[in-house]
Amino acid sequence: MRMQHQDKDDSLQSRVSEQIYKLQSQYLAGVPSARGALAELRKAVDEEPGINPHVWFMTMEAVPERWTGTSDKPNYSELAAFTALTLYAVHQRGKNTPMHVPGIPFAKATGQLVRQRTASMKRRFDAVLTATTFDAQRYHLRSLVGLLSTDGIGFDYGRFANDLVHLQRTDSRPGIQREWGRQFYQSYAFTPKNESK
């Protein structure tokens, strides 16, 4: 299956986007196997990556071969793909519209969510950025994704996976924190002309 990706962009972002787009298209078309796969991914959201062999297989299909781990622990790319896939499954549950929306950053979607609700919800977003472990970040991300699902606000899961790799790395984490902060602020603070009265 990896051979078909040789002529395409083989980045984590494109591979996660491709896999989620396929799942999303099949789910929205009512394909039973896609519903089953999303249910399995949802069940795995709080599990350690690799515990469920089918979910781990789906995760590994989304990780470019050159970025697969070699130790007994998942690496940054594997954790990012696993997190993106399982959170997407939570996000899409019960929705008949796409929750994977290419081009919409996670932080922009979250800014829109907070703008539609209450400013005090920004603390949930801040908790993701200030959490000291990836497990804590995953916990706070799940909370936000649940709220985004409730409000029907989607975002780009391929880009999200790429951002999650950088959020785990101490050398690139400050850059992602700044980028997400800017995206959040721009979405939260600036109302597009078509929304003004």
What spans do the regions from the language model cover?
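Aromatic- and glycine-enriched beta-alpha-beta binding-site module
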Residues: P64-Q112
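Intrinsically disordered or highly flexible coil/loop and linker segments, enriched in small
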Residues: A29-S33, E47-H54, T68-G69, G94-P98, ...
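Conserved binding-pocket/active-site segment within a compact domain
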Residues: M99-R169
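N-terminal domain-start signal
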Residues: M3-T68, T83
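Alpha-helical oligomerization segments
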Residues: T150-K197
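Domain-length accessory/inserted modules outside core catalytic folds
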Residues: K8-S11, K122-D126, A136, F184-E195
